[in-house]
Amino acid sequence: MEVVEAAAAQLETLKFNGTDFGVGEGPAAPSPGSAPVPGTQPPLQSFEGSPDAGQTVEVKPAGEQPLQPVLNAVAAGTPAPQPQPPAESPACGDCVTSPGAAEPARAPDSLETSDSDSDSDSETDSDSSSSSSSSSSSSSSSSSSCISLPPVLSDGDDDLQIEKENKNFPLKTKDELLLNELPSVEELTIILPEDIELKPLGMVSSIIEQLVIIESMTNLPPVNEETVIFKSDRQAAGKIFEIFGPVAHPFYVLRFNSSDHIESKGIKIKETMYFAPSMKDFTQYIFTEKLKQDKGSDASWKNDQEPPPEALDFSDDEKEKEAKQRKKSQIQGRKKLKSEFNEPGEDFTEVHQNWNAHSSASEHAKGYRNREFTRGFSRARYPRSCHGRPPPQHFYNSEHMVSQETSGFPSQRQNNPIMPQYPFPLPVFDMHNFPLRPPPPPPPPPVNMGWATPNMAAHPLLNLPYSLPPPPPPPPLPPPPSSGDSNSHFGPYY
C-alpha cells in the first residue's frame, strides 16, 4: 500500500510540475551501475508478485497518466513516461474505462524498456483484462438472455390464429340467433305401428356438427317444417328444422343438440329417411300454388332481415306491366274523346253531300230528315221540311232568329269551334223541267258562326263582332206556264 501511495504522489508531481519521475519528493531513481536499494525493492516485488491477491487499483480518469506504466518504470529503474498532452487525450474526460480499455493507453517506450518483470506484469494485466472482458461478456449475454423477444408468426400461423378467433366469435346480425343460443331440441320417442305406411323422403347427404342434411327424392310433394322424420326401424329421428333449395328438389335440415346426440340416434351418411304421408299430425305439406300468390323480395332490409310488406320492392316486370296498363287506359280515353269529337263532323259531311244532291225531291227529303246540324244547325231550332212546301217567311226573319238563337241554346253557341266557310251558290231551276215547285234553298247559317268574310258587316240588331247578314228572301213564284204567252220571263224551251 505504501508503494501505491508513493506512485500516486509521483503522478500528481508529474501532472502539475511536468518533470521526470526522478525529480521531486519521491526517491531518486538508481543509476544503472548502482545496486538496487534493499529497502524499496522487496515491496515492489511483493506488489508485482501478487496481482491476483484481490487488491484492486483505482482507475484514473481519462487524461491522467495510467498507473501501470508508472509502476513498471519504478520497477525497472527508468524514468517515468511524460504525460500525454491534453489535445491527445480522449474526448470523454469523465467516462470510466475498464481495465481492458486502459491497455491501449500504454506508451510504447515503456513496453520496449521494460524487463522481464514488466513483461510478467503485463501478462498478468492481460490475463486480468481478459478475465474481466469474459466476465463482462458473460454478464452481457446473461442480460441479453433475460430479455425475451416476441415470436415471429408466419402467414400460415396468422391465418390459423384468425380462423380460431373467428370460430370463437362468429359473425352475426343484430337479431340473429346462433345454433348454441337456440333452445334445446326435444327428444322424440315416437314409434309408428306396422299398419301405417312409410314413404322414403330422401337420403342423408351430410352431417355438419349438430345438423343433419337430407336430400329429397324427386317426384315427391315437398313437406313443411315441423314434419316428423322416421328411420327405417319406424322410430322418430327428428323434426325438420329448415328447408332450402329448389321447390322440385328441396333439402331438409334436422337439428340436434350435439354431435353425440346424432350418434345416439344412429344416423349415418347415405341412410334413407322416411315420412308418414297419411299421418296429418306428423306430416305437413307445402302448397306451391299458395306460394306463387305471395309476393317475395330478395332485398335485405335493416340488420340484414327480411323487409316488411309495406317496404317490399317488386320486380321490374310488374312495374313495366303497370306502366303498360296506364298507357293503354290513356290511349283508350283519347280514342273515346276523339270519337265524340268527330261525330258532328261526320254529320256535317253528310249534310254537304246531301246539299250537292238536292236536285231531286226525294234526295232533298232524305237529306233533311233526321239530320242534326251541330256545327251551326240544330234539330230543335229548325223543324223538318215537308215535300213541296217552302219554309214560312217568319223563319227568315232576322229578329225571330236572334230571339230564337239567344233563348234556345246559348251554351252551344259559345262552345262551337270555328269552322271553315263553304260558299255554295244558289241553284237555278228551269220551271219548264219541273212540274212542281223547286225545293227551297238551304237554311242560312246562324249568326254565331265564328268565321269572317271580306265583305262581312255587323248585323244591325246584334252587338256581335262577327255576324252574317240576313239571307235574301226567296224569289217570287212565277205564274204557271202557258203556250200562248210569248212574253214569259223564261221563254219557250226547244
Curated annotation (Swiss-Prot):
Residues 112-126 have a biased composition (Acidic residues). Residues 324-337 have a biased composition (Basic residues). RNA-binding protein required for the maturation of box H/ACA snoRNPs complex and ribosome biogenesis. During assembly of the H/ACA snoRNPs complex, it associates with the complex and disappears during maturation of the complex and is replaced by NOLA1/GAR1 to yield mature H/ACA snoRNPs complex. Probably competes with NOLA1/GAR1 for binding with DKC1/NOLA4. Keywords: Acetylation, Cytoplasm, Isopeptide bond, Nucleus, Phosphoprotein, Ribonucleoprotein, Ribosome biogenesis, RNA-binding, rRNA processing, Ubl conjugation. Residues 29-41, 467-482 have a biased composition (Pro residues). The gene is NAF1. This is H/ACA ribonucleoprotein complex non-core subunit NAF1. It is linked to Pulmonary fibrosis, and/or bone marrow failure syndrome, telomere-related, 7: An autosomal dominant disease associated with shortened telomeres. Pulmonary fibrosis is the most common manifestation. Other features include aplastic anemia due to bone marrow failure, hepatic fibrosis, and increased cancer risk. Phenotype, age at onset, and severity are determined by telomere length. The lineage of its organism: Eukaryota, Metazoa, Chordata, Craniata, Vertebrata.
